[in-house]
């Protein structure tokens, strides 16, 4: 199922009186300095948009760090006006994305010898539509089945505290998940995991085929399954991409077909 939290993994400032938690101010002499903090282990970038002129500025973070991103004369503007004037949003990845490895052969997200049915393939009529979820695949998996990393990488986000789910959009942010950054700058997400069903930690390096968690039915989900996709970062957030899965292009994983990890 579609899981939108990755488009912006921090909500941008939408109300004039609100300030994102990763933005801070420092008053020094005659200036106001705006700082942004990258709170995750992987690469991120800050997008700053002038609400009036629509001009954009991008700041890249290569590690957990705090950087000065703007400076103003305090006689001309105050902190409230800064938040009113600019929209801040923080995204995974880099603002200038290099070409990814289109020929990489990803592994199936389950153990060797296992066989699962495709519940929903790419670009389908239910939830795998639009740039974010077009190339996602759902495998029908009972609760508690082993989920494996489809590629080696760095774990940058985990969630496993939810025990609820359903069809309604109100459950969208209740999905347990794992996000892994790959060496070529792409990302994979594994969604709808069971409560306390994550076996890896943020900052941990995982190998291809390693068991990283257990399938479930949390979040916006109508039945137990594993939703996963591969993404590239863009200046407007994550975009799902086609890829090769167990030597087969993702477009050939159709609803009702089975995949076996030999």
Which sequence ranges carry the predicted segments?
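Beta-strand-enriched, solvent-exposed domains that form extended recognition/catalytic surfaces
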Residues: 17-96
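Acidic, glycine-rich catalytic/binding loops that coordinate metals and/or anionic ligands
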Residues: 106, 168, 199, 204-207, ...
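Bacterial Sec-dependent N-terminal signal peptides
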Residues: 1-22, 36
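A structural signal for short beta-strand/turn segments enriched in small hydrophobics and glycine
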Residues: 147, 153-155, 203-215
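Short, acidic/hydrophobic/Gly-rich beta-strand patch recurrent on exposed beta strands
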Residues: 137-138, 177-183
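Short histidine-centered loop motifs in beta-beta connectors
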Residues: 186-209
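Active-site loop architecture of trypsin-fold serine endopeptidases
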Residues: 164-168, 215-227
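Surface-exposed, glycine-biased beta-strand/turn segments
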Residues: 64-174
């Amino acid at each position: 199922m579609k899981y939108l939290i990755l488009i912006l993994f921090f909500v941008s400032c939408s109300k004039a009186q609100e300030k994102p938690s990763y933005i801070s101010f420092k008053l020094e002499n005659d200036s106001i300095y705006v700082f942004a903090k990258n709170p995750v282990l992987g690469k991120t970038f800050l997008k700053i948009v002038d609400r009036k002129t629509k001009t954009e500025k991008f700041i890249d973070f290569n590690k957990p760090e705090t950087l000065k991103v703007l400076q103003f004369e305090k006689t001309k503007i105050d902190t409230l006006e800064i938040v009113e004037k600019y929209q801040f949003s923080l995204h995974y990845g880099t603002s200038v994305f290099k070409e990814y490895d289109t020929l990489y052969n990803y592994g199936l997200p389950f153990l060797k010898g296992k066989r699962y049915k495709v519940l929903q393939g790419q670009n389908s009529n239910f939830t795998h539509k639009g740039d974010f979820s077009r190339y996602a695949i759902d495998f029908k998996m009972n609760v508690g089945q082993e989920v494996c990393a489809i590629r080696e990488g760095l774990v940058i986000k985990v969630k496993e505290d939810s025990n609820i789910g359903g069809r309604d959009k109100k459950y969208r942010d209740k999905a347990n998940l794992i996000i892994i950054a790959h060496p070529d700058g792409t990302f994979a997400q594994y969604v709808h995991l069971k409560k306390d069903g994550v076996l890896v930690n943020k900052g941990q390096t995982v190998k291809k085929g390693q068991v990283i968690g257990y399938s479930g039915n949390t979040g916006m989900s109508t039945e137990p399954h594993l939703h996963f996709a591969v993404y590239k970062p863009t200046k407007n957030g994550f975009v799902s991409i086609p890829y090769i899965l167990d030597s087969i292009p993702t477009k050939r994983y159709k609803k009702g077909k089975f995949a076996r990890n030999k």
